[in-house]
């Protein structure tokens, strides 16, 4: 049973006041971000109170809304300047720790190194090209129809909510396929390229769509608001789950070595039916050999094929997607997403040029 939301003005006011006091006493950025998560994150009293406004009598909603607006503004006014202050302090400390003695002889210019993430994405592209597949790339600013409607997401699906998806101002953008989107979003998945490719390339179709996607996640050790996926789509006559499993097994071996193997667990995704979670086993897994979740997959939902004007009684298809950052973390000793996005040259130097 879902937890019943109760609006308690005194409680949320006290919680926000406590959060503001802790903001003022924060000594570093990590502590400050943790305070924001606790007092303004998805599980905070402030967020729960905002959601509970909908259950209030009509004559109380206006005052409750004003109160929540004021509390959020107070929290933001305390958080913003403190964040600037702590960032400046951190930068000064970093500069002080990295001072250079200008009287020392000049050292040899160090060799550069490629960032491991684009190198991994090229490896994945090479795998699909070796099988005769095409590489496809859709736009990052996408029509909501391609990102959700064409993939069988219902109008009330939680993924459409603004706390999960970035919506873009300005609409009615016409694309190459002639579709006019009523809303524009920053794509949340490279699956948005599926129906676009079916409309522009036709069938049979075998494509891989690697690229950046965007979610409203906070940057932490395991999440980032901008990350990379590779979506694979095959549509042809007589394709089955056996074909899907065969491609997944080959990809696992290409990425993790000859002993790697995959298994499928029943799951649910709007754009596939049946759907499965993709698990991976390989001997070099951190902590020893074992199974762990790698991605999602399944047979293309007939409604997705119909969105592209394809007869699901004639054609079938399979699709799967894996996260590139997750794949990289599994293949290396990297343990923190911050290392991938901060642009520290010392991180890239750990990876040999051309590997």
UniProtKB/Swiss-Prot annotation:
Keywords: Aminoacyl-tRNA synthetase, ATP-binding, Cytoplasm, Ligase, Magnesium, Metal-binding, Nucleotide-binding, Protein biosynthesis
GO cellular component, as recorded: cytoplasm
Compartments where located: Cytoplasm
Position of the signal peptide: none
An annotated Gene Ontology molecular function: tRNA binding
Reactions this protein catalyses: tRNA(Phe) + L-phenylalanine + ATP = L-phenylalanyl-tRNA(Phe) + AMP + diphosphate + H(+)
UniProt binding sites for Mg(2+): 273
Chief site of localization: cytoplasm
Enzyme Commission number(s): 6.1.1.20
GO biological process, one term: phenylalanyl-tRNA aminoacylation
Pfam families (UniProt xref): Phe_tRNA-synt_N, tRNA-synt_2d
Cofactor binding, per record: Binds 2 magnesium ions per tetramer.
PANTHER family: PHENYLALANINE--TRNA LIGASE, MITOCHONDRIAL, PHENYLALANYL-TRNA SYNTHETASE
Family: Belongs to the class-II aminoacyl-tRNA synthetase family. Phe-tRNA synthetase alpha subunit type 1 subfamily.
Assembly and oligomerization: Tetramer of two alpha and two beta subunits.
Record's protein name: Phenylalanine--tRNA ligase alpha subunit
UniProt organism field: Bifidobacterium longum (strain NCC 2705)
Gene name in the database record: pheS
């Amino acid at each position: 049973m879902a937890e019943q939301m109760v609006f308690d003005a005194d409680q949320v006011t006290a919680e926000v006041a406590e959060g503001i006091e802790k903001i003022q006493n924060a000594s570093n950025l990590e502590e400050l971000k943790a305070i924001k998560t606790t007092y303004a994150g998805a599980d905070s009293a402030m967020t729960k109170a905002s959601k509970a406004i909908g259950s209030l009598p009509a004559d109380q909603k206006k005052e409750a809304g004003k109160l929540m607006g004021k509390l959020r503004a107070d929290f933001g006014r305390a958080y913003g300047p403190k964040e600037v202050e702590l960032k400046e302090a951190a930068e000064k400390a970093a500069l002080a720790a990295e001072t250079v003695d200008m009287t020392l002889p000049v050292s040899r210019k160090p060799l550069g190194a490629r960032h491991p993430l684009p190198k991994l994405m090229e490896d994945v592209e090479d795998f699909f090209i070796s099988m005769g597949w095409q590489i496809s790339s859709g736009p990052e600013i996408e029509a909501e129809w391609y990102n959700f409607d064409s993939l069988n997401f219902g109008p009330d699906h939680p993924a459409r909510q603004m706390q999960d998806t970035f919506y873009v101002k300005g609409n009615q953008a016409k694309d190459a396929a002639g579709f006019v989107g009523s809303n524009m979003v920053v794509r949340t998945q490279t699956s948005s390229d599926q129906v676009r490719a079916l409309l522009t390339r036709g069938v049979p179709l075998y494509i891989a769509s690697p690229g950046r996607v965007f979610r409203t996640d906070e940057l932490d050790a395991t999440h980032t608001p901008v990350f990379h996926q590779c979506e694979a789509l095959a549509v042809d006559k007589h394709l089955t789950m056996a074909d899907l499993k065969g491609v997944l097994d080959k990809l696992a071996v290409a990425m993790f070595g000859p002993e790697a193997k995959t298994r499928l667990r029943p799951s649910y995704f709007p754009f596939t039916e049946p759907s499965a979670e993709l698990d991976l086993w390989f001997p070099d897994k951190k902590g020893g050999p074992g199974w762990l979740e790698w991605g999602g997959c399944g047979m293309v939902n007939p409604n997705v094929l119909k969105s592209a004007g394809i007869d699901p009684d004639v054609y079938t298809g399979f699709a799967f997607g894996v996260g590139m950052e997750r794949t990289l973390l599994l293949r290396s000793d990297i343990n923190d997403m911050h290392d991938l996005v901060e642009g520290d040259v010392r991180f890239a130097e750990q990876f040999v040029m051309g590997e």
